[in-house]
Curated annotation (Swiss-Prot):
SUPFAM superfamilies: 4Fe-4S ferredoxins. Residues 71-102, 112-141 form the 4Fe-4S ferredoxin-type domain. Its main location: membrane. It is a peripheral membrane protein. Coiled coil: none annotated. GO terms for cellular component: plasma membrane. InterPro entries: 4Fe4S_Fe-S-bd, 4Fe4S_Fe_S_CS, NADH_quinone_OxRdtase_chainI. [4Fe-4S] cluster 2 binds at residues 92, 121, 124, 127. NDH-1 shuttles electrons from NADH, via FMN and iron-sulfur (Fe-S) centers, to quinones in the respiratory chain. The immediate electron acceptor for the enzyme in this species is believed to be ubiquinone. Couples the redox reaction to proton translocation (for every two electrons transferred, four hydrogen ions are translocated across the cytoplasmic membrane), and thus conserves the redox energy in a proton gradient. Belongs to the complex I 23 kDa subunit family. GO terms for biological process: aerobic respiration. This is NADH-quinone oxidoreductase subunit I. It comes from Helicobacter pylori (strain HPAG1).
Length: 220
């Protein structure tokens, strides 16, 4: 291993007299480093601002931003989209979703309780991806501070207002977990049950290569 050579700096001369102390103060205060720092400060002072006055001003968020969950209702009818299948509870990696259901008179699951522990949630979005009815989606509300713990995870905080859904005062959700824009042509039963689009090779095989030969066959 190579031997390291250390360079010893000369010791600073001790200042005793008042004149020497005054000279040392002037040299330290009015040195070149001080003017460099002041020049940088003045330059940044007159440069355009890159910050905003939060919370009076807020930057726009991406529609696929993953923040506090949002439970949706069906438009026009106002009924809850959730069917109580429990897929979101099963796929949750942080075990923060809890659903309690019972079977109703029509042999359909009825939801007794639906809670999300926001203190454990990691906002991965798996619950929104696996939901077959687009009942739970990831919203853009990231300001969820509260003084009471009971307000974290109650269903009423996540669920869409019934009157807003009936009046169609908001558009269909297009953020994280939403279906593709052409879902009307591809959807069969549920939002995640799509018709597979034909590949390029299959479309080429279906397209006739020589239309004139086909016409001759039809005439025969």
């Amino acid at each position: 291993m190579a031997k390291q050579e250390y360079k010893q700096l000369p010791k600073r001369a001790e200042v005793h007299s008042a004149t020497e102390q005054f000279k040392d103060t002037i040299k330290t205060s009015l040195g070149l480093d001080l003017f460099k720092g002041l020049g940088l400060t003045i330059k940044e002072f007159f440069s355009p601002s890159v910050t905003i006055h939060y919370p009076m001003e807020q930057l726009p968020l991406s529609p696929r931003y993953r923040a506090v969950h949002h439970l949706q209702r069906l438009l026009d009818s106002g009924s809850e989209r959730c069917i109580g299948c429990g897929l979101c509870e099963k796929i949750c990696t942080s075990n923060c979703i809890r659903i309690i259901t019972h079977k109703g008179e029509d042999n359909r699951k009825k939801i007794d309780s639906y809670t999300i522990n926001l203190g454990r949630c990691i906002y991965c979005g798996l619950c929104a991806e696996v939901c077959p009815e687009l009942a739970i989606v990831m919203g853009n509300r990231f300001e969820n501070a509260s003084t009471q713990r009971s307000q974290y995870g109650s269903k009423s905080e996540f669920l869409t207002n019934e009157q807003d859904a009936k009046n169609c005062s908001h558009a269909e959700f297009l953020g994280f977990g939403a279906v593709s824009p052409n879902y009307n042509e591809r959807m069969q039963a549920t939002p995640l049950d799509y018709v597979q689009e034909p590949s390029k090779e299959e479309s080429k095989e279906e397209t006739p290569t020589n239309p004139e030969s086909n016409k001759g066959d039809e005439n025969v």
